[in-house]
Amino acid sequence: MNQNLSITASLLGDPGRAAMLLRLMGGIALPAGELAVTANVAPQTASEHLAKLVEGRLLSVERQGRHRYYRLASVEVADAVEALLVLTAHPRTAGLGSASSKAIVGSLEHARTCYGHLAGWLGVRITESLEKRGLIKEYGAKAYSLTASGREWFETIGVGVPSSAIAQKKLARRCLDWTERRHHLAGRLGCAMYKRFRELRWVVPVRDSRVIRVSVEGRAQLWKLLRVPLG
């Protein structure tokens, strides 16, 4: 077990590999070429990094024609990366000098995706509002339970929750946000909510980024339904 921990730690400790993992936290699959650009390494070096991450079970790979697409191997990997981010220095104190870098960090802090669900300030505020209204409740250290009124609320916005899914532990998970240091809603319910917000065009993902923009309609609806202040 100690040896496995040491191997995983060494995989995460390389800046290039860490950059690749962070790029894939949005729950997407990307080809080696894009991940090489993300890590700022040569294609051959990227291939070596990716092979190690696949061997270490941090990434999975799928072949489509001539290309290979890489994604995080599991939600547990995403949780581990998020947990490590919580332990690292806050991005505002990490020595980011350029105005563009600071703008990107600010956008990520405000609203971003985390393996298919909403994170950052927006994700945390939505979660806190759901709790305050009794729509979800803490269920142990790692989960939320969906209340009867919560199930009705989600159905009103178009997120159906089958009775068989309510008791499942992975329906609504608590994910510690690395920028807010508080929990946001993850799991199948968190992913379904984000997907529905996208369908309604309340939130719009920024191309080639984990950053999320909230539309004018989204601002109005999130205030109306959850009293989330977005200006």
Task: Please place each PLM-identified region on the residue numbering.
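Beta-hairpin "wing" of winged helix-turn-helix
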Residues: 54-64, 71, 139-140, 206-207
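N-terminal helix-turn-helix DNA-binding core of bacterial DNA-binding proteins
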Residues: 3-42, 68-70, 105, 113-114
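Canonical helix-turn-helix DNA-binding module
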Residues: 32-59
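Short terminal or interdomain "cap/linker" segment that borders an active site or interface and mediates
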Residues: 217-231
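Amphipathic alpha-helical dimerization/coiled-coil segments
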Residues: 3, 26, 79-139, 157-207, ...
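Basic, amphipathic "hinge/linker" alpha-helix immediately C-terminal to the N-terminal HTH DNA-binding motif
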Residues: 62-88, 146, 150-153, 218
